[in-house]
Amino acid sequence: MVQDMKDYNVEPENITLSMDTLDKKILELLSVDGRKSYRKISRDLGVSVGTIHNRVDKLTKSGIINKFVPVIDHEKLGYHLTAIIGLEIKGGTVAHLIEKEPFKNNLLAVYDVTGQFDGILIAKFKNTFELNKFIKQLLQEDNVTRTYTQTVLNIVKEELNSSMIDFEE
């Protein structure tokens, strides 16, 4: 999910949507297998297929479900290097980077943060040459004053979906 930060001086509306037990169970099942058919979900939960369809439609229209996407194994595509990149930014935000051609293909996550850095990027690369080129291009950005890069030695856990969130509150 990308938050529009065109005017970062305006506080975004903080809306918490409510879900009942059935909605939560549907989300749990879809978090494990996003391709699971409505028919199988309806059997698992003991409700009609129409009910599942209507609930998923409601969850999608309300923005709780943003999209259905595959979970990609980047290693199998040749992206063996994961980098965590801290950015010092001179005014503004890191949000503009996600649309720029040299950056958008490698970025998995972009965060505005507090602390030592103004932004954190998580990116994947095929090799150190690609990472080096990426960093050099970042430093050519007018508002990027410094980068601090850490390469990941071992991925212990990497799930960029919400399957581990406790829906049972």
Language-model features and meaning:
Residues 1-169:
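A compositional/biophysical signature of low hydrophobicity enriched in polar/charged and small residues
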